[in-house]
Amino acid sequence: MIRTIAIVAAAAATLIALSAQAQTAVPASRLPSGKIYLLPATLETTQWGWFDNAQPPVLTIDSGDTVVLETMMHSHNQVVPGRTIEEIKKLRTDHPGRGPHTLTGPIFVNGAEPGDVLKITINKIVPRAYATNFNVPGMFGQFPDKYPDGQVRYMYLDLDKMETEFLPGVFVPLKPFPGIIGVARKEPGRYSSVPPGEFAGNIDIRDFTEGASLYVPVFVKGALFWTGDSHAAQGNGEVNLTALETAFKEFNVTLTALKGVKLEWPRIETPTHWITMGYDADLNLAWAQAQRETQKYLGEQRKLSAVDAAALLPAVSDCRVSQVVNVKKGIHCLIPKDVAARGIPERPTTETAALYVTHAKNANLNTAMNDASMAMIKFVEEKRGVARLDAYGLASAAMDCRIGDMSGAEKNVHCVMPKSLWRK
């Protein structure tokens, strides 16, 4: 089968005909039906730190077409092996208000109009061979006052084994996904790449990987699609500010404008689950929004009243703290597509055979998250003998913080760390 592939250069596009099968290793079930465009990441096809509706599109496609694009490392590829933490901090302080992320785009989707929904399906992800994790000294992250000294660590990504040796003898599994992905806001003007919102953006949901689709409301003509902040792996919490930050050599996505679909807030579909999400500077309000979105989905999926959907939510929704470092903190909930499914993954309060566990509860979810995550960082530091900044970074890359019992006034947070990360 022959498909048309468009290669997009800085100033022009050239069409060539090639076999789709020869170009990618995407499974046949995920091969697109439209044209395939190639979009390299260059200074002409990327923006650093801002969304801006006035930015001219770098590529125009039809609904249902596929784009095989590249992304850059932070700050227009300036955060690469060899950069010191002092240099990384200066990139932030010299550009106040600007996010650190390099965004590929915008891509204009013909036919996408305000009120539509853009479906973004990830077909394939190929990261670069390295990643970085850093905390900027005394700035950002969950605990900037407790970590006034910063650190940057670079690591090789073993794409054959799909793991990286984060520390000597400590291996983190790779699960590549886009930290930032979304469309233009309805409001004009520049907007920092850091806070997420109704347009998606910096959602940092690690379950949004190959084979999953993001559905996001369209606010401007053409939708204007961007992506960046590419991750090789991330913990649920991303507490020290960064995941395993990388760039993608290939990010293969199909963009489809959906007509007649009502959606007010982003939602993700995986092969087995739907994922709802909530964002706010206050984690309590992010949690409240995630609950509302989950109840709304359960009502739609199972034809339930609002009261019945709220009652079902604790039995079927697996809710995690996506991140607490993007100005607006995030919580996402996984709901099984199987309507008969009941039960949620383990939420232990004490150590298990497979997991290190910390647990905290408080009427204020921000406090519960702070206490549970700091307890895990301290545990890794004191019990596993990991240096304090390394423990902070490892928690950001591999800790999984989950929302626990929802029945009482106190909120429960369970943070877990797989023991399998450590190899003797």
Task: State the predicted function of each range.
Residues 74-85, 125-135, 222-232, 323-325, ...:
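Short, Lys/Arg- and Gly-enriched loop/turn segments at beta-strand edges
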Residues 178-202, 206-284, 295, 341, ...:
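Conserved mixed alpha/beta catalytic, RNA-binding, or beta-rich assembly cores of soluble enzyme
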Residues 124-209:
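Intrinsically disordered, low-complexity linker/loop segments enriched in Gly/Pro
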